[in-house]
Regions:
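Active-site metal-coordination/substrate-binding segment of hydrolases
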Residues: 30-31, 41-103
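His/Asp/Glu-rich mid-to-C-terminal helical/loop segments that flank catalytic regions of hydrolases
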Residues: 196-265
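Short secondary-structure junctions
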Residues: 23-32, 67-70, 164-168
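Zn-dependent metallopeptidase/amidohydrolase metal-coordination segment
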Residues: 57, 167-212
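Secondary-structure boundary elements
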Residues: 23, 95-105, 128-131, 214-228
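Short glycine/serine/threonine-rich phosphate/pyrophosphate-binding segments
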Residues: 59, 90, 116-117, 173-176
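Acidic/histidine-rich catalytic neighborhood of metal-dependent amide-processing enzymes
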Residues: 80-161, 168
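A non-catalytic alpha/beta surface segment that caps or lines the substrate-entry region
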Residues: 2-45
Length: 265
């Protein structure tokens, strides 16, 4: 299934996912008529799983792209640019639906890499799409066992997420950077096993992905009736803002040295 997901254009994947959700019992699927912006469907668990459908690479004829898979090492790569950012997140959501009876709320977005079309389109629509929710999990972070909260400053929520085996890191942007403050619900972005994203040497590691998969299943199995509130970070002085910008800059320089291309989220 992962190869099939990698080889689809965003539009092809959009249509494919609607059919997949229907197969798994999601009968109330909401999209924007005539537009490829988002796919939303309400489940029975009040946690929203989010992944985006686009990649940074020119789509062309992705069905003909070269994909290499070392099955012994569990590593995937492509000279065309793999696009595991964020097809790895899409794959994880589908595998949860395939391998378990868990049915969380689902949100697939489009154009996260360019103009955040999908994330912007769901602003103001929380009640319409899902009603009350506990928190949001985006599956769009590079690496292994990392969690990112962006501008959400809820220490209790951070501790709750770290309790599943993740370590907090800083990040710059993904869909929940827009969605969480608009919906006033806390959210987290979790590692899904790709590295060197946004480059032709992007690699995807199955072992890293499986580790997060197991943790997300545990999170969905953990009964949580409370609503985790989005608490915005406050920057009271120019020095606070400068400190934040320097932290982001320094982290990006470290990632460039280690990854060759830096990291977006």
């Amino acid at each position: 299934m992962f190869r099939e997901i990698l080889q689809k254009t965003q539009t092809e994947l959009y249509d494919y996912l609607i059919d997949k959700l229907k197969e798994k019992g999601y009968d109330n699927i909401i999209t924007t008529a005539g537009k490829y912006e988002f796919i939303a469907s309400k489940g029975t668990i009040p946690i929203v799983l989010v992944a985006h459908l686009d990649t940074v690479f020119k789509e062309g004829n992705r069905s003909q792209m070269l994909i290499y898979h070392d099955s012994e090492q569990g590593v995937w790569w492509s000279p065309n640019g793999l696009g595991a950012d964020d097809r790895a997140g899409v794959y994880m959501i589908l595998q949860i639906l395939e391998q378990t009876n868990l049915r969380p709320h689902i949100l697939f977005t489009t154009d996260e890499e360019s103009k955040a079309t999908g994330a912007s389109a769901v602003c103001g629509k929380k009640q319409e799409l899902f009603g009350d929710i506990s928190y949001i999990i985006e599956l769009d972070r590079q690496g292994y066992r990392e969690c990112v909260f962006y501008e959400c400053d809820n220490p209790e929520f951070e501790k709750f997420i770290e309790g599943f085996g993740f370590t907090t890191q800083s990040g710059t942007f993904t869909d929940i950077s827009i969605i969480c403050p608009d919906w006033e619900v806390a959210g987290v972005n979790l590692s899904v096993g790709y590295i060197y994203e946004h480059s032709r040497i992007e690699h995807f590691y199955e072992a890293m992905w499986k580790d997060t998969y197991k943790k997300v299943v545990k999170m969905l199995e953990t009964k949580c009736d409370r609503v985790w509130k989005y608490i915005p970070k406050e920057y009271d002085t120019q020095s606070d803002i400068y400190e934040k910008l320097m932290k982001i800059y320094n982290n990006s320089q470290k990632e460039k040295k280690s990854n060759g291309k830096g990291s977006k989220c």
